[in-house]
Amino acid sequence: MRILFFGPNGSGKGTQGSIVKGKYNIPHIESGAIFRENISKGTEIGKKAKEYIDRGDLVPDEITIPMILGRLQADDCGNGWLLDGFPRSKEQAIKLDEALKEAGMALDVVIEMILDRQIAKNRIMGRRLCENDNNHPNNIFIDAIKPDGDKCRVCGGALSARSDDQDEDAIDKRHNIYYDTDTGTLASAYYFKAIAEKDGSVKYITLNGEPSVPEVTDELVGKLG
């Protein structure tokens, strides 16, 4: 099963992606990790990407898409894959769609997690880290994992907030890109939605990202089949 996963920062997309990975035995591939791996290994395409990054420029699609395709063709992708974090524009969606089809890896499913922008922002700003274990879930805006004051709900350890989780300008900037239905990430998602509505060659799934993690998972698994 070959899946594209869309969702704003704060939607719980990463959590659901990990669940899909385990249930369907496919890798959860994050586009940023592909860049980091190629750059750290010093691959030729990684070196080219690094030149743009070091100049503060966007890496062109002519480099990004072949890099992504290379990862999607790795041995661990025999059962499929879940790609997260790309594309981020309609133009990139068109190019990726064409490249996947040419490589014989046409998409099976596109998932869009839907969440109100303010709720997504609150979830990011509400995240708290436990001094004993960062994997202990605590969020002052999510009732199911709301801590007891400034103490971890799991172990009672002291909690703190990551500085980047409190940077409203940075959060707003990321969300501006994601929620832009004309040129941003949602525009790329809607490109695939139009294909699904036109000929059904790809399955387009929408998920309500507001309920609890188990509830969202149940909806996702039910729709994936």
From Swiss-Prot:
Which Pfam families does this chain map to? ADK
User: Residues annotated as region LID?
Assistant: 126-165
- Subunit relationships: Monomer.
Does this entry carry the keyword Kinase?
yes
Q: What GO terms in the biological process aspect are recorded for it?
A: AMP salvage
What HAMAP family has UniProt attached to this entry? Adenylate_kinase_Adk
**InterPro entries membership:** Adenyl_kin_sub, Adenylat/UMP-CMP_kin, Adenylat_kinase_CS, P-loop_NTPase
Top-rank lineage group of the source organism = Bacteria
Positions binding AMP in this chain are 31, 36, 57-59, 85-88, 92, 162, 174
Q: Which UniProt keywords apply?
A: ATP-binding, Cytoplasm, Kinase, Nucleotide biosynthesis, Nucleotide-binding, Transferase
Give the protein family: Belongs to the adenylate kinase family.
- Which EC numbers characterise this protein's activity in its record? 2.7.4.3
* Amino acids binding ATP: 10-15, 127, 211
Sum up the protein's function in the record's words. Answer: Catalyzes the reversible transfer of the terminal phosphate group between ATP and AMP. Plays an important role in cellular energy homeostasis and in adenine nucleotide metabolism.
The main location is cytoplasm
**CDD domains reported in the protein's UniProt record:** ADK (cd01428)
Q: In which pathway does it act?
A: Purine metabolism; AMP biosynthesis via salvage pathway; AMP from ADP: step 1/1
List localization entries.
Cytoplasm
Enzyme class of the recorded protein, top EC level: transferase
Q: What is this protein called?
A: Adenylate kinase
What intrachain disulfides are recorded?
Answer: none
